[in-house]
């Protein structure tokens, strides 16, 4: 979320950075919405001030036994009481319109981010290692996994539909080993604190990290049908009894509860009940980890705060129709180790480089060839100021192999912190917004693919990387045995 005051102070600078993403200038539109909000606030405050003044004048008129003036003032106060709810509503509507507009605007790229339209304009920052050579034609992971009878897409489709997989035996254990290895390195050597967060979160958490409202179609949400129906019945009963203040506060925080009550006359009970009971499946552990500091004021002596989690992640992949339809590259459910850092503004640049090096290190120990890309302005994520992608070499992809993304490391500045109201207090005692960073450390499912394809043997077996063998009970080769 952007600061409207900063936009007002320098709209040209805002638009100069914003248009680097290939978007049209927007500062004046935001200023117009803020002007409308200020105008509505002024009208409401003037009406309230006049009501207060008139109420006082009524007492003065009565003391002076000026009944005519007292009656005129009482009539004025009565009229103000009638008009003020509409003025208050106008303030709320104008404030909501500005907040909605600001919430749908992406972060501004840093000055050193290369300009470009899409992934073809990303810049190679570095390489590590070399591509492996084979005396045979490497196969894709799904052919190897199915031949081993340890990767079953058909069974997964019967259970859940497309873009799911069932892993068995050695490959299931290998995926678990990769995740545990990543987690151990990050916690024991890189200074991250392990967190086991919920996989279901509220709207507020998804808004805080900027998945909502812009990317709702890419998410999975769940709602308990029985709770919805029960809550509907209780709502209707209290509405009929003209006692809406006693609607049960079952699942919702006070701030949201009050807002919903205000909208009773405009919304159907079914819609409200669903909103009260729904939760979102996390698309990444970035969401719960980053939101752990929501509505907090941290001591800057404790920063940077580094957290990591190994979780399942869920994505609808609404924009991926027809892409990567075979194999495990693009799944609705996948495992990932996430890295999150919360820093001061002065620390965030160095922390970004450090986070990238942590993600690189686990791939180096797996002896996988990869390259690091600096994403251009047209390919950056919504909340990012600057992003590095790590693309690992997968010899079984396409004709002759391909680089595929396995990690994204992004610095977000105070963009998410403003949405979450996450601040820190320094030596001067004044609170200020923190900076947030997130990165994959790395995607476990894609790391599994990379290991399968890079460590495949001519007979279809998979050699287990040395660093993973202790997690596999000493197993050195996964075969169909």
From Swiss-Prot:
One GO-annotated biological process of the protein: seryl-tRNA aminoacylation
Which reaction is the catalytic activity of this chain? tRNA(Ser) + L-serine + ATP = L-seryl-tRNA(Ser) + AMP + diphosphate + H(+); tRNA(Sec) + L-serine + ATP = L-seryl-tRNA(Sec) + AMP + diphosphate + H(+)
Q: What does the record's free text say on domains?
A: Consists of two distinct domains, a catalytic core and a N-terminal extension that is involved in tRNA binding.
Query: Quaternary arrangement and interactors, per the entry?
Result: Homodimer. The tRNA molecule binds across the dimer.
The gene is: serS
* Gene Ontology MF, one: serine-tRNA ligase activity
Q: Which organism is it from?
A: Rhodopseudomonas palustris (strain BisB18)
Name used for this protein in its record: Serine--tRNA ligase
- Top enzyme class, one word, equals ligase
């Amino acid at each position: 979320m952007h600061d409207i005051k900063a936009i007002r102070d320098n709209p040209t600078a805002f638009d100069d950075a914003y248009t680097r993403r290939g978007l049209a200038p927007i500062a004046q539109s935001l200023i117009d919405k803020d002007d409308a909000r200020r105008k509505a606030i002024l009208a409401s405050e003037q009406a309230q001030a006049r009501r207060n003044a008139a109420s006082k004048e009524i007492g003065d008129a009565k003391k002076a036994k000026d009944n005519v003036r007292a009656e005129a003032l009482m009539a004025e106060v009565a009229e103000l009481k009638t008009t003020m709810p509409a003025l208050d509503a106008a303030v709320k509507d104008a404030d909501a319109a500005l907040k909605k507009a600001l919430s749908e605007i992406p972060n501004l790229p840093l000055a050193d981010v290369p300009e470009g339209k899409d992934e073809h304009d990303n810049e190679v920052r570095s390489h590590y290692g070399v591509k492996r050579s084979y005396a045979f034609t490497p196969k894709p992971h799904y052919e190897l996994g199915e031949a081993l009878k340890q990767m079953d897409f058909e069974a997964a489709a019967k259970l859940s539909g497309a873009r799911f997989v069932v892993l068995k035996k050695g490959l299931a254990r290998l995926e678990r080993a990769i995740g545990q290895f990543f987690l151990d390195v990050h916690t024991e050597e890189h200074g991250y604190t392990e967190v086991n967060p919920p996989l279901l979160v509220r709207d507020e958490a998804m808004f805080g990290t900027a998945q909502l409202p812009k990317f709702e179609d890419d998410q999975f949400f769940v709602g308990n049908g029985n709770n919805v129906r029960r809550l509907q019945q209780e709502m209707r009963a209290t509405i009929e009894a003209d006692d809406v203040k006693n609607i049960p506060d079952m699942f919702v925080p006070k701030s949201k509860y009050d807002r919903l009550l205000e909208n009773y006359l405009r919304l159907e009970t079914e819609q409200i009940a669903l909103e009260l009971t729904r939760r979102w499946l996390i698309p990444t552990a970035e969401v719960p980890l980053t939101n752990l500091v929501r509505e907090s004021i941290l001591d800057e002596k404790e920063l940077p705060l580094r957290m990591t989690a190994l979780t399942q992640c869920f994505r609808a992949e609404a924009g991926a129709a027809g892409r990567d339809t075979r194999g495990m590259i693009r799944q609705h459910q996948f495992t990932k180790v996430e890295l999150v850092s919360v820093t001061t503004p002065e620390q965030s640049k160095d922390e970004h480089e450090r986070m990238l090096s942590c993600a690189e290190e686990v791939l180096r120990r797996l002896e996988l060839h990869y390259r690091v890309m600096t994403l251009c302005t047209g390919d950056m994520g919504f909340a990012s100021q600057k992003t590095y992608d790590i693309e690992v070499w997968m010899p079984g992809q396409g004709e002759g192999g391909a680089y595929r993304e396995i990690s994204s490391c992004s610095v977000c500045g105070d963009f998410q912190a403003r949405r979450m109201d996450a601040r820190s207090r320094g030596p001067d005692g004044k609170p200020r917004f923190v900076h947030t960073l997130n990165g994959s450390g790395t995607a476990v499912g894609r790391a599994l693919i990379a290991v399968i394809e890079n460590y495949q043997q001519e007979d279809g077996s998979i050699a287990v990387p040395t660093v993973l063998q202790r997690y596999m009970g000493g197993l050195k080769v996964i075969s169909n045995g």
